[in-house]
C-alpha cells in the first residue's frame, strides 16, 4: 500500500505508541498483555477462585467484562444521569462459576467500579492502560464473530446476508480506538455509516448545530477509515465522494452498498490479531513469564506458543460437543472466523467444520440456564503449525486490482487458490451504474470481471513448525482446488443480540 509511510503498525495502534522499532513494539505489547495477566491474577485472589475456577473461560469473560464496564466512561455518566431501578451505576459484576461438591454453581458478584479501576491500574504500573482494555474488547469481538451471525443487522441496513464475511468487528464498541478500527471489516464500516446517514435523513437536526459539527467530524473520520481499507483507486474515489457529500442521503447509501458488494471480490485490508482471554495471560504471568522482557507480538508465533501450553476449561451444556466448543474458541483466539476453513484446518491440524455443523452454542451461559446439568471440559486450543496474521485482503496482485476470496477475509498469510464462481457475484451488479459515481462503478465492475479465479493469493507464503520461531522454513500447503471453505455455509447460528 502506497501510504505505508504514514501508517503505524497495528501493534503500535494497539499500544497507543508513536513509531517504534520492532523491539520496542514487542516490549510495549508485552507490557500490555502482562498487565492484563497481573490484573487477572489479582481478581482471582479477590474472588477467592481456585486454580481450576480461574482457568474457566466463563469466569475470565466475566472478569474482562467487569473491567471494561468499570472504564466505560460514557455509559457510567449516562447511568448516573438516568438512574434505572435496580441498577447501581457505581457497581459492576457478573456470574462467577464455582465448583462445589462435584457440581458447578453460579454466583453473582458485585464490585465497586472504583475498586476494579484501582486493581487494573495497579496491575498496569498505575496507568489507565487503555490499550489493554481495547485488547480485551477485540477478543470479545472475535468471539462474537465466531459465535453469532449478523444476518438481521445486514438486512436492516439494506445489505445482503451473503456479505457476512465483511462483518468482522461488528460488535466492537465505538470507543475501541485505532486498534479497533484496524480490525473492522468493510461491511462493518459500511453499516456504521449507513446507520449514521439514516439518522440524518430521519432527524433534521442530526447534522446541525454544535453537536452536528461533531457528528460531521465523526462521519468524515469513519469515511476515511473505510477509504483506507480499500486497495483500488476507484473504490477510494467513491469514498471521497461519500465523505464530501453536503447532505448525505440515499445516494450515499447506494454508493456504500455498491462498495460493500465490490469488496466481496476486491477485498479490503482488514487487520487480524490473536487476542486471548485474560486467564491465558494470567496463567503465563503466574508461572513466572515476563512478557515485557521477552516481548510479545499479536501477529506472530507468540499467541500460538502461549496456547500450546495453557490449559483452559469451559462449561459445557448437556448436548454440546466439547470438540466443537474448542473449535469455536480456537477460531476466536486467532481471529479466524472469516478465514478459509481449508487454511484453518491445515494450521490447526484437525478438521475445522462450518458453523452449520457445530453442536455447540455460545461460550457465555445465560442467567436462566440450569447449572445442575452443567459439566466442564478442557478446551483444545493447540495447533499443528503457526502462521503470520495478515492485514491484506488477499487480492492476488497488489499492484493492480485483482481478486480475493469471495466468502473469506483471510487471517493467515498462507498461499491458497481462489475457487470462486465469479458469475454468482457479478449477478449482484446488474444495471445501476448511473449517478455521480457511474464511471467509477463501471471501472470497479470491469476490474471484477477481469479477476481470474485461477490465481493464488499470498503466493509462496506458508505455515511454520512451532519449533521454527524465526519463520525460516515456510511449508506451503496445497489445497483441494474445488471447494473454498466458508465457515458460514449452512449457517444456523444464533443472532447476536446486544
UniProtKB/Swiss-Prot annotation:
UniProt keyword RNA-binding, yes or no: yes
Keyword Magnesium carried by entry: no
Residue positions of motif Bipartite nuclear localization signal: 198-216
Location(s), subcellular: Virion; Host nucleus
Cleaved signal peptide residues: none
Region of interest called Disordered, as start-end residue ranges on this chain: 1-21, 79-98
GO biological processes: symbiont entry into host cell; viral penetration into host nucleus
Short sequence motif named Unconventional nuclear localization signal, residue ranges: 1-18
Compositional bias annotation for Basic and acidic residues: 79-91
Pfam families with a match to the protein in the record: Flu_NP
Any one cellular-component term (Gene Ontology): host cell nucleus
Record's keyword terms, sorted: Capsid protein, Helical capsid protein, Host nucleus, Host-virus interaction, Ribonucleoprotein, RNA-binding, Viral nucleoprotein, Viral penetration into host nucleus, Virion, Virus entry into host cell
Gene Ontology molecular functions: RNA binding; structural molecule activity
Modification note: Late in virus-infected cells, may be cleaved from a 56-kDa protein to a 53-kDa protein by a cellular caspase. This cleavage might be a marker for the onset of apoptosis in infected cells or have a specific function in virus host interaction.
SUPFAM superfamilies noted in UniProt: flu NP-like
Role summary: Encapsidates the negative strand viral RNA, protecting it from nucleases. The encapsidated genomic RNA is termed the ribonucleoprotein (RNP) and serves as template for transcription and replication. The RNP needs to be localized in the host nucleus to start an infectious cycle, but is too large to diffuse through the nuclear pore complex. NP comprises at least 2 nuclear localization signals that are responsible for the active RNP import into the nucleus through cellular importin alpha/beta pathway.
The protein's assembly and partners: Homomultimerizes to form the nucleocapsid. May bind host exportin-1/XPO1. Binds to viral genomic RNA. Protein-RNA contacts are mediated by a combination of electrostatic interactions between positively charged residues and the phosphate backbone and planar interactions between aromatic side chains and bases.
Record-stated family: Belongs to the influenza viruses nucleoprotein family.
Protein's recorded name: Nucleoprotein
